Amino acid sequence: MHYQPKQDLLNDRIILVTGASDGIGREAAMTYARYGATVILLGRNEEKLRQVASHINEETGRQPQWFILDLLTCTSENCQQLAQRIAVNYPRLDGVLHNAGLLGDVCPMSEQNPQVWQDVMQVNVNATFMLTQALLPLLLKSDAGSLVFTSSSVGRQGRANWGAYAASKFATEGMMQVLADEYQQRLRVNCINPGGTRTAMRASAFPTEDPQKLKTPADIMPLYLWLMGDDSRRKTGMTFDAQPGRKPGISQ
C-alpha cells in the first residue's frame, strides 16, 4: 500500500496492541508511537514488553504502559479485570489491534491434535472475543474508534493442512463482520491479512522458506497506520490485504 501519512496522524490517540512483544505487533506498536499515539502494550512475556517499551521511550520520549495477559489461559474475568486496570489510567481507547495469534499444527485434518486445536481456538477466537467484549466500553468512548483483527488468506479460502489456524481465521472474519454490523455508526471494525511476512510464526509454518524473499513487518505498516487514522474513517466491515496481489503459500 502506497500511503504516506502525516507525522501527527495519531496524535492524542490511545491504541492497544496485543502480541506487542514480537514481530508485527512489536513493529505496529513502535510505528503507532512514532506517529504520535499513546501506545498500550499487551503480551505474555514481560521482559520482551519491557524492551519494546524502552525502545519506544528512547525514540519518542513517551513511556508506554504494558500489561501481561496470556491468551492461552485467560478467562472472561481476567479480560474484564484488565479492562478495569486500563480504565483507571486511560479515559478511552481509540484503537485496538488484535495481533496476537497461535499457529498450531500444519498437518492434515486426520493428524490434527485435538488439544492443539483447542489451544488455537482459545487464543485466536475465544480470548480475542473475550478481550474485545471487555474493551468495547472503552472503544465506544472514542469518537473515532478503530478495532482491527488479524486475518489470513486461509481464513477466506481453506487450504490443505491449515486446519485449526484456517478455521480460527474464518471465525475471526465472521466476528469482525458481526461487530461491524452491530456498531455501524459508532466503531470501525476491519481485518488485516498481513500476507507472508518475516516473523517467527512464518518461519515455523514454512521452515524451508528463504526469509529474505519476504516483506518485513516494517514494510507492511502503511496499512496498519491507515486503518488507525482518520483517512479510513468510513471503512468498516472490510478485510484488507497488506500485500495485495501476493500469491498465498511459500515465497519463490
From Swiss-Prot:
Enzyme Commission designation: 1.-.-.-
InterPro entries in the cross-refs: NAD(P)-bd_dom_sf, Sc_DH/Rdtase_CS, SDR_fam, YciK
Active-site residues per Swiss-Prot or TrEMBL entry: 165
Signal in keyword set: no
Xref: Pfam families: adh_short
Family the entry assigns: Belongs to the short-chain dehydrogenases/reductases (SDR) family.
NCBIfam families tied to this protein: PRK08945.1
Protein name stated in the entry: Uncharacterized oxidoreductase YciK
Annotated source species: Escherichia coli (strain K12)
Organism lineage: Bacteria, Pseudomonadati, Pseudomonadota, Gammaproteobacteria, Enterobacterales
